[in-house]
Amino acid sequence: PQPEIIELIQDKRKQKQFYTSNNIPTAKYILTNSKQEVVDNKHFLPAVNKLGTEGYDGRGVQILRTVDDLDKAFDKQGLLEKLIDFDTEIAVIVARTVTGEIVTYPAVELVFHPEHNLVEYLFSPANVSAEVAKKAEKIAIEVIEKLGMIGILAVEMFVDKKGDVLVNEVAPRPHNSGHQTIEGNITSQYEQHLRAVLGWPLGKTQQILPAAMVNILGHEGYTGIARYEGMDEILREEGVHVHLYGKKITKPYRKMGHVTLVAQEPEILKNKVNFVKKTLKVKA
């Protein structure tokens, strides 16, 4: 993406201000500069304390539900974001060319690790109503247009209990929430990104089959040279595709790769996802 867009997006404070200044729906928030300022705003709890910069893969995020959690607050520039009572988390991948052509991919449903704030697995398409899917698509298009961005943009969103869709954050690149497009959609997010930045016509985004993605994470309690258990077993499964990142050293919850899966039926797909999660382990 363009340098000015990287500058905006790499700071979550600037991101949130961009959303509010452009009337893009997002959770209420307060900018903070220190741990004391977080404590001073305890009336805003329950909330999520996010670092302005340096956060990635779940790092730089603390959930503060009550005053007893305030010790976990960051003593750096960041923000307090109102904790959303959401039904599900979704993402829409959107692409835009220099000529303004835009396409979106079907919304995907994200399932996060309960403790480490990073995506554990996802399903595509998301199990949401047509109305919610349409809202999410419209918001993703609005975000990439307002940014004036060229390339692929992943827009992560909450769907609350009322069916409202709120932007959480965005990533200006091929993203974890689009890996399944390699096997699951007519055009992968990687090919689409190249088409967008080269000014070529954008590819079709329709879903070929129900698809899923499971992140391969370092197993808890193991640090050292990575050793994969269960690889042979999962590779025998039809529709299972392993993508490793070539990282030699594993650490607890480090992203070591991902598995993309396709199946004819959503129920079969869920069973395959559970099998991969249970079988494939990264130890040392």
List PLM regions with ranges:
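Active-site nucleotide/adenylate-binding loops and adjacent lid/helix of ATP-dependent enzymes
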Residues: 6-91, 95-143, 277
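A short, glycine/Asx- and small/polar-enriched loop/turn
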Residues: 43-44, 160-166, 253-255
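Peripheral (often C-terminal) accessory segments that flank ATP-dependent C-N-forming ligase machineries
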Residues: 195-284
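Protein kinase-like catalytic core scaffold
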Residues: 103-106, 153, 165-169
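Short, flexible active-site loops
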Residues: 116-126, 169-182
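A short linear hydrophobic-aromatic micro-motif
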Residues: 28, 46-49, 78-81, 153-154, ...
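Active-site "cap" helix and flanking loop/linker of ATP-utilizing ligase/carboxylase catalytic domains
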Residues: 135-155, 161, 171-223
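Short acidic-glycine loop/turn motifs at beta-strand connectors
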Residues: 96-101, 160-163, 263-265
